[in-house]
Structure formats: structure tokens, C-alpha cells
């Protein structure tokens, strides 16, 4: 699902809300979440999951085209850990089609 599809879905489900309000709410939420992660904060949404940063130590990588060694610097990468309710939801029997795709 893309951001546009999420906005359309919410507009369909919440038809009493103006389209612009839904768009602004989604954009503001994503912007605030991005800013929080950029500031090193952890985001927890109960029942859904949590977003945090994981540290990646510096290492030597390889350029896949040339095979040349490349020094990769240390960095932080966003990480999502699903909550218990989300893990259980995606593993329900009625979601077996999803599980068969993987």
C-alpha cells in the first residue's frame, strides 16, 4: 500500500472528513515520525509495533560490478519491530494466502 492508497482508503472510510484534512493528517504524521527517528527517538504504537534506529558498524564492502573493496562508514538505519497483535493478525488462518506468497 502506498501513501496515496492509504489516503484514498481513509477518505472512503471517513467520508465526513474533508480530503485535504486527511491528506494533511497523514503527511503530518509521517513527517513527525521521520523527525522523531532522525532525532534518535523511538516510536511505539501499541498493538502495531515500534520504530527505532539500529547502528551499523563500519565495514569493508565490495562493489558488485568491479569486486573492488569499498570502505563503508558507520550509520544508523531505521528498524521496525512488529507488535504482538500485528504478528498474530498476519498469521491467522484466513491470511494463509499472504503466507503462501512468501
Swiss-Prot record:
Pfam families: Bac_DNA_binding (PF00216). GO terms for cellular component: chromosome; cytosol. SUPFAM superfamilies: IHF-like DNA-binding proteins (SSF47729). This protein is one of the two subunits of integration host factor, a specific DNA-binding protein that functions in genetic recombination as well as in transcriptional and translational control. GO terms for molecular function: DNA binding; structural constituent of chromatin. Keywords: DNA recombination, DNA-binding, Transcription, Transcription regulation, Translation regulation. InterPro entries: Hist_DNA-bd (IPR000119), Histone-like_DNA-bd_CS (IPR020816), IHF-like_DNA-bd_dom_sf (IPR010992), IHF_beta (IPR005685). Belongs to the bacterial histone-like protein family. Heterodimer of an alpha and a beta chain. This is Integration host factor subunit beta.
Amino acid at each position: 500500500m502506498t501513501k496515496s492508497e492509504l489516503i484514498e482508503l481513509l477518505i472512503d472510510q471517513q467520508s465526513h472528513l474533508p480530503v485535504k484534512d486527511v491528506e494533511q493528517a497523514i503527511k503530518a504524521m509521517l513527517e513527525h515520525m521521520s523527525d522523531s527517528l532522525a532525532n534518535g527517538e523511538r516510536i511505539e504504537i501499541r498493538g502495531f509495533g515500534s520504530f527505532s534506529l539500529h547502528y551499523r558498524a563500519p565495514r569493508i564492502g565490495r562493489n558488485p560490478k568491479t569486486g573492488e573493496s569499498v570502505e563503508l562508514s558507520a550509520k544508523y538505519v531505521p528498524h521496525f519491530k512488529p507488535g504482538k497483535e500485528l504478528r498474530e493478525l498476519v498469521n491467522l488462518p484466513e491470511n494463509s494466502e499472504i503466507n503462501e506468497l512468501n
